[in-house]
Every structure is written in structure tokens, then in C-alpha cells.
């Protein structure tokens, strides 16, 4: 199946329909050198001219592979050849034996967010695409079948006053590759993307083995889940506005009578959000921990 490249007009419509920006925006773009981020850079390079803004390609060298430093130099030349400013962040660390992807991801976001604050960048784009979204959906589905997190990767996420924007979530990876090919842009290939020790790689290979019809079915399920979760989010927001009080030192108060009338699903998600915020954590507690707490509270 041949996938068409993404046109300038198509991309412009996507941005204007889903996102808003300040006048003459300064936007950071996470660039790994893969087809996804190179396609995003190409599309943004044209779009930003209309707003008279500027973009900065931000590359994070995880320093996990011997060839990563050489790849960074090759990438810098490619980006500068496109007329885009480039900056590199190198992660210096000791050997990591476990939870490599999780630790690397957390460190990457931490350092990139810090750089954006320093440069007064309030919008950061990443090149997550439809394939990534489906992979994440399947991975989360295996872990937690009813969580709001199952709706997968959000278009916009705000972290420390920085908007993390993902404008490519509606596009297949094949279309991003076609976009690079049309502009004769070669992308880098990370060999870790083929290492089946990582769950995401195994899920990716699983999806590759499925028919187009099956992929469409999974995507349809994902979209339905988004609609269901949006309705849940509205109910949670309504509860927070009416029944939640926050105090100093992470203390919160909710109306027990109103809380007890909610469904178990809403109770779990409400407590997840409260505890994540009160604890200053990036990730919410596990569902089984919340259930244990609810059962304990019920017995008292």
C-alpha cells in the first residue's frame, strides 16, 4: 500500500484546527533524526514562516550507544542544511542495567524542559505519530483495562508551564517516511528500534503482522475509548469543582457522602489524580493500590 506524503496545506489545517500559538512563536522541536522527527521539522520549517516565528531543533543524546555521538554530528549537519537552528543535550550517566527506557525518557524530558525554561520556549513539539499511539494503547491495555490512561497519547500535555504538543498523532509513520522521501531527506535508523527486549518493539512487530483491516479496528477501539474517557473526565472535573478542597502540604478534603455515590471507576480515577498532584509525582499510583485503599476505607 502506497502512502501519500503530507502536504503543507494539510499540515496547516491540522495545526489551525487543533492548536493555538502566540504571535511570532518560538517553538522547540524534539529531533532524534528518525523519519518522524525529520518530517515534523520539514513541515514546521515551512509553517513557521507564515507566523514570522522561529523553531529550534533539540536533540537529546542518550549516550547509550557507541555510535550516538557520531549520529548527533551527522544530524546537526542535516538540520543546519535545512536552515534550522540546532542544539544538543548530552546525558552523562553511569551504566544502566534495568528500566533503561523509563529512566532515559524521564531524564530526557527533565533536561529538555529545563532548557526550554532557560530559552523562554513555551511550546515544545514531539513527533509521536499514529503508530506510536496504537502501540501505547495496546501496551496500556495489557496493564490496565479501565484506566483513563488507556486513551493513549494526548495531543497536548502541560508540564511546568511548558506545552508539549504532538501534531503528528493523526498521521501514519509511512506518511512521514513518504514526506521525507519527497524532499529527499535521509533519516537515521536507531538499531534499538529492532531490539525485542523492549516491549514497544515487540508490540510494533505484532502490529506489522496484522492486516490493514485489523489496524483500523484497533484504531476504532482507541477512538471509542477516547470518547468514553472524555465523558469520565467531565464527571471528574464536575466533582472536583464542587466537592474538592486543597490545603497546604498536600492535604486535601472531599465530601465522603458524594464520593461514595460515585462508580468504582470514577473513585479510582479521582484518587489517582488527587494523589499524583498532592505527591508531586509524574505518574499516578497503580490501580491495585487505589483499590486496596478504598477497601481499607470501606472497612473503617
What is each residue range found by the language model?
Residues 142, 211, 275-279:
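Hydrophobic/aromatic-lined pockets within catalytic cores
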Residues 172, 211, 263-264:
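Residues that cap or delimit alpha-helices
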Residues 182, 214-218, 229:
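Glycine-rich active-site loop/lid subdomains used to bind and stabilize high-energy intermediates
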Residues 204-218:
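Conserved anion/nucleotide-ligand pocket segment
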